[in-house]
Amino acid sequence: DVNAVTTFDYTAYMLDYREHTPALIDEGLRFFRGIAEGPTFDPQAIVWESRVILAEMRSRDSVTTRQQMDNLPVIFRGLGFTRHTPIGTEQTILSFRREHFLEFHRRNYRPDMTVIVAAGDFDPEQIAGQISASFGALPKREDPPPVRNEGRLNARGLRAGIFRIS
C-alpha cells in the first residue's frame, strides 16, 4: 500500500508491506529513490492528480474545516504558514505546470533534508544496508537548503473568556 501526506512543514511517503522480503523492500526503496532523484512530472499525470486533489478538497469542504482554517491565524499569530493550507487553493492547483513542480522538487527534495524510517519485524543491519545501498550515492548538493522564514509566534499571556453561540 502506498500513501503520502503533506503537512505545513513536511511531506511523508509511506509504504506498508504485509510481507517484507528483501526483494520487496528493494522495490520500495527504488520507489523512494525515484522520488528523491526526481519524478518525471508527466503533464498528463499532473492534470489527473489535480483532479484528484480538487475532489479531495471538495470532500473536506465543511463548516468544521473552514472554522479550523479561520482559527489558524488567531492561534498561530505571527507565523506565515497560516496564509495557506498544505493542499493549496483551487487557483494554485489549476495553475501549476510541470516547470513549477520541477523547481519545487529541485529546491526542496534534497538528500540533506531527507529522513528514511523503517519499522517492522526485520533485521536492522540488513535494512540499514539496503537503505545505504539505495541512497548512499545520492549526490550532495553544494547550495544550502532553502531558508524558510515563517515568522515568529506572537506569545500572549493566558486569558479566560465566555463564548456564547446563539
Regions picked out by a protein language model, each given a short descriptive name:
Residues L15-E49:
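M16/insulysin-pitrilysin zinc metalloprotease superfamily fold
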Residues D1-A23, Q44-A45, S59-M113, A133, ...:
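Non-catalytic beta-strand/loop surface segments
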Residues E19-P22, G120-E125:
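Helix N-cap motif at beta-to-alpha junctions
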